[in-house]
């Protein structure tokens, strides 16, 4: 089976993945697929660091604004949506470029989790429904029975982990249809932290408070409201924190999230990282993509 070549850009938040994705899309006739679990939601633009209107006009973006904030979204949903987008992009002779930071989503797509083949989709849905009916105590008992330990336990993580364990044999044998070039962006920790702090400041200047307050007043308990960028501001709205304290909390949580992202990509995916402050960046990335696609550099 001839596999479909795709480019995947990963790295910590605020590292510049969107800008690189647009650059590659222009250079290699590509279209971008968002691999971010929060950017699927309509009306949540600033806190999710969604590509701006100008950026979306510079390159076609997929899987942005495809869910209402009241709806849930999972790795299963992402794989189904991403598969359709990849097929659509390739059918028009273009290069799929996945830009994202949600490690589980990307791993699920690239390693065949929830793809067709040996995995019985109806069985997956039935098992997920069974788990969702359990209370927290019974759900975590299932984790212990299966010798599963996960960090920062919550229901969604627990259900994902149990699904993977339940269908491990089928998933192990499920072959992905893609040949990915995984490009990792990173730099010194202080460089990344400074970029995160600057981004949070820009978000607040650009209207994050209004966006977060709308979410808090209308849908404070939905899945979308638990994303970094919103929940940190909720205490400010009820007078439990000053704006400066809430802003600092958001910066700290985002830095911690960036660290977790890097740990995930290093441990779970075969990533070769490029420093964004290197003198030959992004030319070195363009060269890697050109070699991957078997293209010659234009003279």
Curated annotation (Swiss-Prot):
Keywords assigned: ATP-binding, Magnesium, Nucleotide-binding, Transferase, tRNA processing
Record: residues binding substrate: 13-18
Assembly, per entry: Monomer.
Enzyme class label: transferase
GO biological process, one term: tRNA modification
Family recorded in the similarity comment: Belongs to the IPP transferase family.
EC numbers on record: 2.5.1.75
Protein name as catalogued: tRNA dimethylallyltransferase
Positions that bind ATP: 11-18
Gene3D superfamilies assigned: P-loop containing nucleotide triphosphate hydrolases
InterPro entries named among the record's database cross-references: Dimethylallyltransferase, IPT, P-loop_NTPase
Alphabetized PANTHER family for the sequence: TRNA DIMETHYLALLYLTRANSFERASE
Cell inner membrane keyword on record: no
GO-annotated molecular function: ATP binding; tRNA dimethylallyltransferase activity
Taxonomy of the source species: Bacteria, Bacillati, Bacillota, Bacilli, Lactobacillales
Cystine pairings recorded for this chain: none
Site (Interaction with substrate tRNA): 102, 128
Region (Interaction with substrate tRNA): 36-39
Named cofactor requirement(s): Mg(2+)
Role this protein plays: Catalyzes the transfer of a dimethylallyl group onto the adenine at position 37 in tRNAs that read codons beginning with uridine, leading to the formation of N6-(dimethylallyl)adenosine (i(6)A).
Domain of life: Bacteria
Organism for this UniProt entry: Streptococcus pyogenes serotype M1
């Amino acid at each position: 089976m001839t596999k479909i070549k795709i480019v995947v850009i990963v790295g910590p938040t605020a590292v510049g993945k969107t800008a690189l994705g647009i650059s590659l899309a222009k250079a290699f006739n590509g279209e971008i697929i968002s691999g971010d679990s929060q950017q699927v939601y309509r009306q949540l633009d600033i806190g999710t660091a969604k590509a701006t209107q100008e950026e979306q006009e510079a390159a076609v973006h997929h899987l942005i604004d495809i869910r209402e904030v009241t709806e849930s979204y999972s790795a299963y949903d992402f794989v189904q949506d991403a598969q359709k987008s990849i097929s659509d992009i390739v059918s028009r002779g273009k290069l799929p470029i996945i830009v994202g930071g949600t490690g589980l989503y990307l791993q699920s797509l690239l390693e065949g989790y929830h793809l067709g083949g040996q995995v019985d989709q109806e069985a997956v849905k039935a098992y997920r429904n069974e788990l969702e009916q359990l209370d927290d105590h019974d759900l975590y008992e299932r984790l212990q029975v299966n010798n599963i330990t996960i960090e920062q336990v919550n229901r969604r993580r627990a259900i994902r982990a149990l699904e993977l364990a339940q269908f491990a044999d089928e998933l192990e044998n499920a072959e992905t249809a893609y040949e990915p070039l995984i490009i990792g962006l990173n730099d010194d920790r202080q460089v990344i932290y400074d970029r995160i702090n600057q981004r949070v400041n820009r978000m607040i200047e650009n209207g994050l408070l209004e966006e977060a307050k709308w979410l808090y007043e209308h849908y404070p308990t939905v899945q979308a409201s638990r994303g970094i960028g919103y929940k940190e501001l909720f205490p400010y709205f009820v007078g439990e924190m000053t704006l400066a304290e809430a802003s600092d909390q958001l910066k700290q949580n985002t830095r911690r999230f960036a660290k977790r992202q890097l740990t995930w990509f290093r441990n779970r995916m075969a990533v070769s990282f490029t420093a964004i402050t290197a003198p030959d960046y992004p030319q070195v990335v363009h060269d890697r993509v050109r070699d991957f696609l078997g293209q010659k550099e234009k003279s």
